[in-house]
Curated annotation (Swiss-Prot):
Role summary: Cell wall formation. Catalyzes the addition of glutamate to the nucleotide precursor UDP-N-acetylmuramoyl-L-alanine (UMA).
PANTHER family per UniProt: UDP-N-ACETYLMURAMOYLALANINE--D-GLUTAMATE LIGASE
A GO molecular-function descriptor: UDP-N-acetylmuramoylalanine-D-glutamate ligase activity
Subcellular location: Cytoplasm
One Pfam family recorded for the sequence: Mur_ligase_C
GO CC terms, sorted: cytoplasm
One GO BP: regulation of cell shape
This protein's encoding gene: murD
Protein name stated in the entry: UDP-N-acetylmuramoylalanine--D-glutamate ligase
Lineage of origin: Bacteria, Bacillati, Actinomycetota, Actinomycetes, Bifidobacteriales
Record-listed ATP binding positions: 110-116
Gene3D superfamilies, alphabetized: Mur ligase, C-terminal domain, Mur-like, catalytic domain, NAD(P)-binding Rossmann-like Domain
Length: 479
């Protein structure tokens, strides 16, 4: 793709974090840059109908716009290139001050686990003395990072939205954490969704890291065309096979050779109990966070970083907020507790399943619901019915979750929170949960849905959960 922008007119669609960054990066590189955003007063254009297509050379699009959006279809009909911020960043890479070559890129995608894995990867590489910021879908614009010569490595969280309009990535290391139904309304189906995720594996140079416990990801990994020297490294929560890193007898064990041992022979890397950042107060290690750590470790060692420094950083890493985090604890009269756990970042069924799987049978009062994004939940409820003691249904799009319980677990008690008052929804949900919770139980908010119907973001939803949980604990004293 020709990225010579001299004298060209570029449209930037959507002026959020990535859009604003593209406007700034393109300002000194293109002939004319016009931002389009219906909600931003300072946008150059406030309607896509205002675009002068006859004098437009390129379109940079925000992830919010799906491929069937009219302005995208119009651009494609006119053979005007449409690309993501990630594609722009890749095309505009500058040489690093350290090496005189473009910064290495590590790309991380998947339905769940992207953010934690990206953060872990960044922290380990930073501990190894590299300038390795976490950028991309994680909230920090990749286009600014790509044109900053101070960076040695970019740890890029990549969403399927970003990858759809990305064409030429050839990453140094790449990982797909897992693939499950999500954003199907945007992509038009699971096959399109998986195909966009698979773009990270194309022509990977050093290490292709895949979830060996996920059949779809494994197939994509072995179907991918890579550089001849690239190693395929599977991660698993079971005993690893040749070419994998996994868990055996309380140890992280490498069978791929990336950790210093011989490929095909077990090499003990670290004790699982070393990873206190992955545990709750009772010492429980959450399996999905351990999987994220294995992914990040494989990426970092696959890049060639120092193992000891990387492990030291990983052992001290603390996950970000709203990821299966205990936010309040009520003491009960029998000396036990009721825990309130915020996993607001579990915005799809796959993430909610991982969260529910972390707890004992019939111990979870589950707060679920929100924007379903075209997903169905029958299988999730069927699989996790053994764990769920009661369900509290929030959100404006309640029917998919209600249908799932009716079909898969009709005997589980349920409270439905009236969606008409957004300001009190979480308070009412917590109060309802409190009527079911007893000693030893967990009130878990892992909604399996997006948050924007009733909250500003998943973080806002999590913060409100924490506030209302603490309010309930304060009001009830000993439950």
């Amino acid at each position: 793709m020709d990225m010579n922008m001299d004298g060209k007119t570029v449209i930037v669609a959507g002026l959020g974090v990535s859009g604003q960054s593209m406007m700034e990066v393109l300002g000194s590189r293109a002939g004319r840059v016009l931002g389009v955003d219906e909600k931003k007063p300072d946008a150059d254009l406030h309607s896509f109908d205002q675009i002068d297509w006859d004098n437009t050379d390129m379109v940079m699009t925000s992830p919010v716009f799906n491929p069937r959006t009219p302005f995208i279809l119009e651009a494609q009909k006119r053979n005007i290139p449409v690309m993501s911020e990630v594609e722009l960043a890749w095309q505009l890479r500058v040489n690093s001050n350290t090496t005189g070559k473009p910064a290495q890129w590590i790309g991380i995608t998947g339905t769940n686990g992207k953010t934690s894995t990206t953060e872990m990867t960044s922290e380990m590489l930073t501990a190894c003395g590299l300038a390795a910021p976490a950028v991309g879908n994680i909230g920090k614009a990749v286009s600014h990072a790509a044109v900053d010569p101070a960076n040695d490595v970019l740890c890029v969280e990549l969403s399927s939205f970003q990858l759809h309009f990305t064409y030429s990535l050839e990453l140094d290391c790449a990982a797909i954490t897992n693939i499950a139904d999500d954003h199907l309304d945007w992509h038009g189906g699971i096959e399109n969704y998986a195909a966009d995720k698979a773009k990270v594996f194309h022509n990977v140079k050093k290490a292709l890291v895949y979830n060996a416990d996920d059949e779809r990801v494994t197939k994509l990994a072995f179907a991918a065309q890579t550089a001849p020297e690239c190693r395929r490294i599977g991660f698993t929560l079971a005993e690893p096979k040749d070419g994998q890193i996994g868990v055996k007898d309380g140890w992280i064990v490498d069978m791929s050779g990336i950790a210093g041992g011989e490929a095909g022979k077990p090499f003990q890397v670290a004790k699982v109990t070393d990873f206190t950042h992955l545990t709750e107060p009772d010492g429980t290690v959450y399996p999905h966070l351990l999987a994220d750590a294995l992914t990040a470790l494989a990426l970092v060692l696959g890049l060639g970083a120092d193992k000891d420094k990387a492990l030291a950083a990983l052992k001290q890493f603390t996950p970000g907020g709203h990821r299966i985090q205990t936010v309040a604890v009520a003491k009960t009269s029998d000396g036990g507790t009721i825990r309130f756990v915020d996993d607001s970042k579990a915005t799809n069924a796959h993430a909610a399943k991982a969260s529910l799987n972390s707890f004992a049978d019939k111990s979870v009062v589950w707060i679920a619901g929100g924007l379903a994004k075209g997903s169905r939940f029958e299988q999730l409820v069927a699989d996790q019915a053994r764990t769920i003691k009661a369900a509290i249904i929030i959100g404006k799009d309640q029917q998919p979750m209600l249908d799932a319980f009716k079909a898969s677990a009709p005997d589980i008690p349920m409270s439905i929170i009236d969606p008409t008052d957004n300001d009190t929804v979480m308070a009412r949900a917590i109060d309802a949960a409190g009527t079911y919770a007893q000693s030893g139980d967990v009130v878990l908010m892992a909604p399996a849905c997006a948050s924007m119907d009733q909250f500003k973001s998943y973080a806002d939803r999590g913060n409100q959960f924490a506030q209302q949980a603490q309010r309930w604990v304060n009001e009830h004293g000993e439950a």
